[in-house]
Regions:
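Flexible, glycine/small-residue-enriched loop-and-beta-strand segment within the central core
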Residues: 30-35, 44, 55-64, 69-110
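Terminal amphipathic alpha-helical/low-complexity segments used for targeting or macromolecular assembly
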Residues: 1-43, 48-49, 87, 102-103
Length: 110
């Protein structure tokens, strides 16, 4: 059975945080310390060279082209399909929603 050494894990996190702060002068979440933004984008099937923060909320059918940057705390709602092209920059906190306007408005959003 796998036994986790929490003290070693805490030390690893402290060490990684210090390295990131020294290099970039900023603090990042544990998720961002342990996962790679390009790996996250690849997991979602986004285009080559695209980076996507771990805390992005992705709903429905979202397609993203090559070399696009998706910042932290972004919401991409592809409920009615969403396609973002190549070489785009989606800033932190941006929220993009799609839906069938006629159906949505006549159903009172239900």
């Amino acid at each position: 059975m796998f036994e986790l050494d929490f003290r070693a894990l805490q030390e690893l996190i402290r060490s990684q945080r210090a390295k990131v702060y020294e290099k970039f002068k900023r603090h990042v979440s544990i998720n961002d310390l342990l996962s790679d933004r390009w790996e996250t984008a690849e997991f979602y099937g986004f285009g080559e060279g695209t980076s996507c923060y771990n805390n992005v909320l992705i709903l429905g059918d979202v397609r993203v082209g090559k070399n696009t940057w998706i910042g932290p705390n972004v919401v991409l709602d592809g409920t009615a399909g969403l396609e973002i092209g190549d070489h785009c920059s989606i800033s932190a906190g941006v929220q993009i929603y799609t839906h069938n306007t006629v159906n949505w408005s006549t159903s009172l959003g239900v």
